């Protein structure tokens, strides 16, 4: 069952929903999205991306891109995560997503308990991807986009299982990291990766 569109602000107000995917993984970018929905073109079945099947997310991804008034997918790269830390990199990526919208919203509703610095008012909504349709839509765009990227990395860096765990610190990933060493897409600032780098640097076996 999808979210109720009566939960959003009045249709005359342009509200952007903003969400992120990829704060916890050991590798890859953190990906964000901002979406302004069109009240005259409702999208049925919007919900927190984690509560939807992959097939449903893929279908909704295309529908959101087609029907939304405006949408933007943005990111902060591994190098930025390592330089800034994951929280600040996430805020930067959210800022980029909102700034990339072709329409300027009157309000940005951010999933979570922190808001990035924006040119318009912002409101943090804890578990917003389960409450606010625009945030749910943003969560779907961000997750599908990042999952596709992880599937591509699976082919570039075989043996790590990236396409399955999406970079999260699962036992499979940690074992592969210890056995194969880190790749260029791993986040050096995260402890398991840093430890793997130190071990491999001692042996001169860092991948390039």
UniProtKB/Swiss-Prot annotation:
<feature type="domain" description="RNase H type-2">
    <location>
        <begin position="13"/>
        <end position="202"/>
    </location>
</feature>
<feature type="binding site">
    <location>
        <position position="111"/>
    </location>
    <ligand>
        <name>a divalent metal cation</name>
    </ligand>
</feature>
<keyword id="KW-0540">Nuclease</keyword>
<protein>
    <recommendedName>
        <fullName>Ribonuclease HII</fullName>
        <ecNumber>3.1.26.4</ecNumber>
    </recommendedName>
</protein>
<dbReference type="GO" id="GO:0003723">
    <property type="term" value="F:RNA binding"/>
</dbReference>
<dbReference type="GO" id="GO:0043137">
    <property type="term" value="P:DNA replication, removal of RNA primer"/>
</dbReference>
<dbReference type="InterPro" id="IPR036397">
    <property type="entry name" value="RNaseH_sf"/>
</dbReference>
<feature type="binding site">
    <location>
        <position position="19"/>
    </location>
    <ligand>
        <name>a divalent metal cation</name>
    </ligand>
</feature>
<comment type="function">
    <text>Endonuclease that specifically degrades the RNA of RNA-DNA hybrids.</text>
</comment>
<keyword id="KW-0378">Hydrolase</keyword>
<keyword id="KW-0255">Endonuclease</keyword>
<dbReference type="InterPro" id="IPR022898">
    <property type="entry name" value="RNase_HII"/>
</dbReference>
<dbReference type="InterPro" id="IPR012337">
    <property type="entry name" value="RNaseH-like_sf"/>
</dbReference>
<dbReference type="GO" id="GO:0005737">
    <property type="term" value="C:cytoplasm"/>
</dbReference>
<dbReference type="GO" id="GO:0032299">
    <property type="term" value="C:ribonuclease H2 complex"/>
</dbReference>
<comment type="similarity">
    <text>Belongs to the RNase HII family.</text>
</comment>
<dbReference type="InterPro" id="IPR001352">
    <property type="entry name" value="RNase_HII/HIII"/>
</dbReference>
<dbReference type="InterPro" id="IPR024567">
    <property type="entry name" value="RNase_HII/HIII_dom"/>
</dbReference>
<feature type="binding site">
    <location>
        <position position="20"/>
    </location>
    <ligand>
        <name>a divalent metal cation</name>
    </ligand>
</feature>
<keyword id="KW-0963">Cytoplasm</keyword>
<keyword id="KW-0479">Metal-binding</keyword>
<dbReference type="GO" id="GO:0030145">
    <property type="term" value="F:manganese ion binding"/>
</dbReference>
<keyword id="KW-0464">Manganese</keyword>
<dbReference type="Pfam" id="PF01351">
    <property type="entry name" value="RNase_HII"/>
</dbReference>
<dbReference type="GO" id="GO:0006298">
    <property type="term" value="P:mismatch repair"/>
</dbReference>
<dbReference type="GO" id="GO:0004523">
    <property type="term" value="F:RNA-DNA hybrid ribonuclease activity"/>
</dbReference>
